[in-house]
Amino acid sequence: GYFYLRAVLTQKKIIKLRMPVMSIKTILLVLGLILSNTVCAFAKDGTIDTGDTAWVTMSTALVMMMTPAGLALFYGGMSRYKNLLNTIAMTLVAYCLASIVWVGWGYSLAFGESSSLFVGNLNHLFLNGIDVDSITGTIPTIIFVLFQMTFACISVAIILGSVVDRMKFSSWIIFTILWITFAYAPVCNWAWGGGWMHKIGALDFAGGNVVHINAGVSGLVLALFLGKRKGYGKEAMIPSSVTFTALGAGFLWFGWFGFNAGSALAADGIAASAFLVTNTAAAMGGLAWLFVEWKHSKKPTLLGLASGAIAGL
């Protein structure tokens, strides 16, 4: 609407005020345009859902915390004191390297469209073709890239537990780059990028195959290849800080809500169900380990409780 004020001063006369009234047709036309634009903003297919975007963004931050905070403290606390700082440093450098590799070529190999059923292409090298307007599902593609990046980071960091005290820092750097490129990205493509596992209907909701089996098998192979730690079976392998391990388990437990519930890529009932199951599994795992250890050794330990919770997750 609008109005204007016209004042006319005449000889000893009052100010006259005139206010034109908009026609009914004009008012209806303006309201119609406003309502139609409002409806279109919510009805278009392929548009960004702010609720889903906010949830996946928060989940990305939660999963990110699992590596430089959760695993760093969890593994660092269980390692011998002389390896504490080195273990934490290896966790942090794994996160940094995996982040760069993922943005550079890892994402493209994992999610790039390709006729091959085993690996993607390099069309999205250094995120080529992805901008602020790109959408995956109901969230910005950039957020999807970051969420998947945190999965790649924690996957390679999980392997670190198999090589603590047995692998040089420089060798770990090389391994991280090669593993993300030739192990993680292809397996990710198989399950989530339209590869052969996806084609046969395999369901990997939150990384059971891509993350845990992949990292677990790789860690086993590395442990067998490197052999036992020096002094194993002869010297006491005393954890440097059980407190660190317990704190790390807490960070991992907290971050795992984003890991599992965030994998729904939406703020919906599936995410809520995953959230509930995640917490229940961790709690049950911790209690089961605690009571079994209590019965077996007549004494429960904080290390056992923390280990059980992570095993449940």
Model-derived segments and their meaning:
Residues 1-2, 263:
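N-terminal leader/targeting segments
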Residues 2, 12-13, 35:
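Intrinsically disordered, low-complexity peptide-like regions
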Residues 2-4, 42:
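Aromatic (phenylalanine/tyrosine) cluster motif
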Residues 6-8, 56:
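A generic signature of intrinsically disordered, low-complexity regions enriched in glycine/proline
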Residues 10-28:
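Bacterial N-terminal signal peptides that target proteins for export
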Residues 23-313:
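Hydrophobic alpha-helical transmembrane bundles of multi-pass membrane proteins
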